[in-house]
């Protein structure tokens, strides 16, 4: 008897008790190794904590071609007081699974749970199988980018990291993640009135999937506020914290600043002006975003004026959002940029930018342009991750078989589309010659945000499509 999705949900619940932000995947990597040991399956763990678990073919299918199930173990943690210790409290409402006040981790925890349920099952028909789970997919892809050539044997890959239930993802934009650091010196704070301006209520979202939805970036809104304030009075800044993750549209920000004693009215005027600007530009697409100013405690140190001016100049010049729509793929963003995080650190102001494009040359050119903007203000830029774009042949036998399984199981064919977010597939194509990849998954809405949710019925459907696809692939070479 084919197992139901009940076990998938049980595994997902177990995963969500393990905090797994990017760069801190040791515990979930341990979980995967223990999972393999419990099933007496061979596994390998590399220095990046990536894990591949190998399962022999079902009896009678030993000569079939090896099949790979691909997922990542990290998640974007939003709304958590401490991402390294806070578990996720999931609940079901109106046919959707959601989380209370945090991101859910369905990206990519549901796909990983499916893969582990397949490993556990003795009823599912499949050939030799490898389940590979990578690290740091959400913030640099260092796991996939550093895989050794002997880590994987299979050349047909089912990636379970898609978020569009009615599609087979057959391509993904390339991406370049850059960190920029503006040198800063701190000096004793002057006398004056202290305030904290906070931006909150924004929808945020995935900086690839949601970049074309016209949402307000809390970084750009903060820049507007600071620019408007400096046109009316002098001020000093003690601390900056904008954005939640490099791969998310910033939905919140906080700046602590000081103004002269007679400038309280100016601060109130700038607050009103900023909220007016937000309403006029984002009132429909992001109605909850707002700016609020409140008095705060006196701070001891402030950033030097030149560094603050350099930051504002850079944030003004660096583009945010869609730069170009594709001329060959309908309703598809070709090139975009997102300013993910801005914060004061020891000796610098840190800024992250995430550039995406289906054209590698355009991505490289835009990344260089952004680095040049920061360089002109004395900043140093570092490319943390550069992933190539990926495009499969939509007429390949593997993709057609995947499409056939949707038709036979669900009664309809999915669309084959290229998506404006980076997938690890680009690195797999580079590392493993001859590899073919199809990416499928349940419907996940607003990933990388506290509104993240997954539709339960689509998990059921994708589970049965996956089982049928594995069965049909389990034929002798």
What are these regions (language model features)?
Residues 215-232, 261-263, 306-316, 324-327, ...:
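His/Asp/Glu-rich mid-to-C-terminal helical/loop segments that flank catalytic regions of hydrolases
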Residues 332-419:
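Substrate-recognition/cap regions that form aromatic- and gly/pro-loop-enriched pockets
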Residues 93-98, 102, 137-139, 144-356:
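Midchain, well-structured core segments that form catalytic/ion-binding scaffolds
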Residues 217-219, 224-240, 392-435:
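Active-site-adjacent substrate-binding region
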Residues 61-155, 191-194, 308, 316-319, ...:
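Active-site metal-coordination/substrate-binding segment of hydrolases
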Residues 2-96:
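Acidic/His- and Gly-rich active-site-bordering loop/insert found
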Residues 327-350, 354, 410-468:
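Zn-dependent metallopeptidase/amidohydrolase metal-coordination segment
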Residues 73-75, 132-140, 161-165, 203, ...:
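Acidic, glycine-rich active-site loops and adjacent beta-strand->loop/helix elements
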